[in-house]
């Protein structure tokens, strides 16, 4: 026999027992998000889900996303309870753009050293996001990778699948001149632009871990970490009230802001004319712009600037759409209109 010590996986930095403990902690989280279509529970090699009844020609819609360097701020502030909501929101809001109903969600959690309490807190947030989206958390992967990440660092990715009736897919091809753009308010910076947010914090000299500064009636920490708003229920209410045919286009305002995201869903011959007087920057965005001396054009192409989602509807449907969205709990307003395109796809006036 060799005199060398017998090595275990734990000696290499991977604690299987911690992983098992996490699974036990989060089983109830996943169960609380279940839908009737889900077959089985956590722990299998693959998760099963039926397509909901009532669809004639269903199309599956998939998406994946993360939360960027907002994670670095979460780690700095030791706030892990809402970052999971961010993860779900980034995925499900993308699926909404084509008119899809989110069905199920999976997450990937990678870390240098698994902290079961932190991971369970994150997954609890994912579960909360899934409940807000009527979306089942049906599986995921937790990877402990010593040497790949610093001990406490972790990264997240989310994966979502939804369903839409083929005849009701929203493509943007029906957008016409004179259509109205309706804005849905964001809850803050959502999950985009946080590398610039962190740079602004650095140059401002503000210690965000201890600052008592208030923005928008809340602590600067709460303002910076406010979870991304989930628009699933509001868009469902709009579809039920107006019908999908009245929703000519939708856009989730993420990285790239209004400037880069609106053109993704608009015809090449039309431009979105944005009425910049229709809303005011929140104190958060004003603080970021002032502390970072950021040009207005850079604000519009980096942050959502208070507009988290945009819907394009016929002019005669605008008032009904705003009322429906308001009744669903959203702050909604007329953001602008579609005009003939001369140069830029988005025009600020």
UniProtKB/Swiss-Prot annotation:
It is found in: Cytoplasm. Keywords: ATP-binding, Cytoplasm, Ligase, Nucleotide-binding, Purine biosynthesis. GO terms for biological process: 'de novo' IMP biosynthetic process; adenine biosynthetic process. One of its GO terms (molecular function) is phosphoribosylformylglycinamidine cyclo-ligase activity. It catalyses: 2-formamido-N(1)-(5-O-phospho-beta-D-ribosyl)acetamidine + ATP = 5-amino-1-(5-phospho-beta-D-ribosyl)imidazole + ADP + phosphate + H(+). Its EC number is 6.3.3.1. The keyword Ligase applies. It comes from the Bacteria. GO terms for cellular component: cytosol. Pathway: Purine metabolism; IMP biosynthesis via de novo pathway; 5-amino-1-(5-phospho-D-ribosyl)imidazole from N(2)-formyl-N(1)-(5-phospho-D-ribosyl)glycinamide: step 2/2. The keyword ATP-binding applies. NCBIfam families: purM. Belongs to the AIR synthase family. This is Phosphoribosylformylglycinamidine cyclo-ligase.
């Amino acid at each position: 026999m060799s005199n060398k010590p017998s090595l275990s996986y734990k000696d290499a930095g991977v604690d299987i027992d911690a992983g098992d403990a996490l699974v036990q902690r989060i089983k109830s989280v996943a169960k609380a998000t279940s839908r009737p279509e889900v077959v089985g529970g956590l722990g299998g090699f693959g998760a099963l889900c039926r397509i909901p009844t009532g669809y004639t020609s269903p199309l599956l819609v998939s998406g994946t996303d993360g939360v960027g360097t907002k994670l670095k701020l979460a780690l700095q502030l030791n706030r892990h309870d809402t970052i999971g909501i961010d993860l779900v929101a980034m995925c499900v809001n993308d699926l909404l753009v084509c008119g899809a109903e989110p069905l199920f969600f999976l997450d990937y959690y990678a870390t240098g050293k698994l902290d079961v309490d932190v991971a369970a807190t994150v997954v609890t947030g994912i579960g909360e996001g899934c409940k807000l989206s009527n979306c089942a958390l049906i599986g995921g992967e937790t990877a402990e990778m010593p040497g790949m990440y610093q001990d406490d660092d972790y990264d997240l990715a989310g994966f979502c699948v939804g369903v839409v009736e083929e005849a009701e897919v929203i493509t943007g091809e029906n957008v016409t001149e004179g259509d109205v753009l309706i804005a849905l308010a964001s809850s803050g910076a959502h999950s985009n632009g946080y590398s610039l947010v962190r740079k602004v914090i650095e140059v401002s000299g503000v210690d965000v871990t201890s600052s008592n500064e208030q923005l928008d009636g809340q602590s600067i920490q709460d303002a910076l970490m406010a979870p991304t708003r989930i628009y699933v229920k509001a868009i469902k209410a709009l579809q039920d009230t107006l019908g999908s045919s009245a929703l000519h286009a939708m856009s989730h305002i993420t990285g790239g802001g209004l400037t880069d995201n609106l053109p993704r869903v608009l015809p090449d011959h039309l431009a979105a004319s944005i009425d910049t007087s229709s809303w005011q920057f929140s104190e958060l965005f004003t603080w970021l712009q002032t502390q970072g001396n950021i040009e207005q054009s850079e604000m519009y192409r980096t942050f959502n600037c208070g507009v988290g989602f945009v819907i394009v509807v016929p002019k005669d449907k605008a008032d009904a759409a705003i009322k429906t969205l308001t009744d669903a709990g959203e702050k909604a307003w007329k953001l602008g209109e579609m005009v003939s395109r001369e140069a830029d796809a988005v025009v600020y006036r």
